[in-house]
A protein has these predicted regions:
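Bacterial N-terminal signal peptides that target proteins for export
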Residues: 1-8
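Alpha/propeptide regions of enzymes that mature by internal proteolysis
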Residues: 22-383
Length: 383
């Protein structure tokens, strides 16, 4: 059977480090506040690397895995971090230790709901095989690893009970993580996701906040079409043609979103947790109410203060922004989150999956016409 997941190394590299899509939200003239970084991606925070493995096979496999390395895949140096669940009907492993220690001590993986265990165990196997040790949990020749793996449910388009994500797919995402443009839409863990009634997936965006950068990467699988609001315009209500074939109504309240916030601003763990909370406001700008069945789980980290987990002496010296200086960082978080979600939808393409279910993408022309109707269409961004 022909597979969209190709096994030769050259093809894997293409899948794992694809450039940003030809069109993103700003290219359509969608107005956003704030100034993005050069890539308008989470990789604008120096050192971060992102990898995807995308699985599209036959009529029913529509899934994958995405990995974010806070300091790049060559580093095991933890970052200060914190997490927040806006609504907890979901999973992000490793967060008990994040809460306790204040450190993000592994790459952050995102996949489908029923592949969390495979991804977690595969990363531990990769650590053991490559003699990589966590920065906080190692004694002598031994270590114990508590990887961070998050999920959203892709069962409308993917045979999620088939658990098609295998260890080699995790290894490939790890090994081919790169800086620079980040693939969006139907890639990695976002391959089979649905966002506000349209095809969703992976999206990213960044902001410049003074001399610092703040960025978001999302796996968007939440919301109903009637909620979708872009640039203050009720886009979902205006674009009322069917976009999801026979999706059960209760599923509208049971989607989820994973949001990863990164910054190079010097923040303490309690401050990164405050950043994670602000991602909620970016999501709310688009109309989400975070329903009872939704797993809306966010994690934030700061790449400042290297070696804070392994001080050379009895005392560790770290730097931090005063709380009174966090306003621009909070604002940038909200802005980057909002745009990352829209970028996921703009990049996504129509998809047919398991049981013949079809989800169509957000129509670019219809979106532009709707924004124009409300006098909210801007000049497309220069490329």
């Amino acid at each position: 059977m022909m597979r969209a997941y190709l096994c030769c190394s050259a093809a894997l590299l293409l899948l794992a480090s694809v450039p940003a899509p030809a069109q993103r939200a700003r290219d359509l003239g969608i107005p956003f506040d704030g100034t993005p970084g050069p890539w308008n991606a989470i990789t604008d925070v120096a050192g971060i690397e992102v990898g995807h493995t995308t699985l599209i096979e036959g009529d029913s496999v529509r899934t994958g895995v995405t990995v974010i390395w806070p300091r790049g895949r060559q580093s095991d140096d933890p970052t200060f971090g914190g997490w927040f669940a806006l609504n907890g009907n979901g999973e992000m492993t490793g967060t008990t230790w994040v809460e306790e220690s204040g450190f993000v001590d592994s790459p952050i993986f995102i996949t489908n709901t029923h592949s969390v265990g495979t991804v977690r165990d595969s990363y531990i196997r990769w650590q053991a095989d490559h003699h990589r040790r966590p920065g906080t949990n190692s004694v002598g020749d031994g270590f114990w690893s508590l990887p961070i793996v998050a999920e959203t449910y892709d069962g409308f388009l993917n045979d999620t009970n088939g658990q098609h994500v295998q260890p080699q797919h995790v290894f490939d995402a790890i090994e081919h993580a790169r800086s620079g443009p980040v693939g969006e839409g139907n890639v990695g863990g976002g391959t089979g996701m649905i966002c506000f009634g349209f095809k969703g997936g992976i999206g990213t965006s960044s902001r410049v906040a003074g001399k610092y950068h703040v960025a978001a990467l999302v796996q968007c699988n939440c919301g109903s079409k009637r909620q979708l609001t872009i640039a203050g315009v009720p886009v979902g209500r205006e674009l009322d043609r069917p976009t999801v074939a026979s999706i059960p109504k209760p599923l509208e309240d049971r989607g989820s979103i994973i949001i990863v916030i990164a910054t190079d601003a010097p923040l303490l763990p309690t401050q990164t947790k405050r950043l994670a909370r602000r991602a909620s406001l970016g999501l709310a700008r688009l109309g989400s109410v975070s329903g009872n069945g939704s797993g809306d789980i966010f994690i934030a980290f700061s790449t400042a203060n290297p070696k804070a987990a392994q001080p050379s002496g009895e005392l560790a010296s770290v730097s931090m922004l005063p709380n009174d200086a966090l306003g621009p960082i909070f604002e940038a978080t909200v802005q980057a989150t909002e745009e990352a979600i829209v970028n996921a939808m703009v990049a996504a393409r129509d998809m047919t999956g398991v049981s013949g279910h079809t989800v169509t993408a957000l129509p670019h022309d219809g979106l532009k016409q709707t924004l124009q109707k409300y006098n909210r269409l801007a000049q497309p961004a220069a490329r």
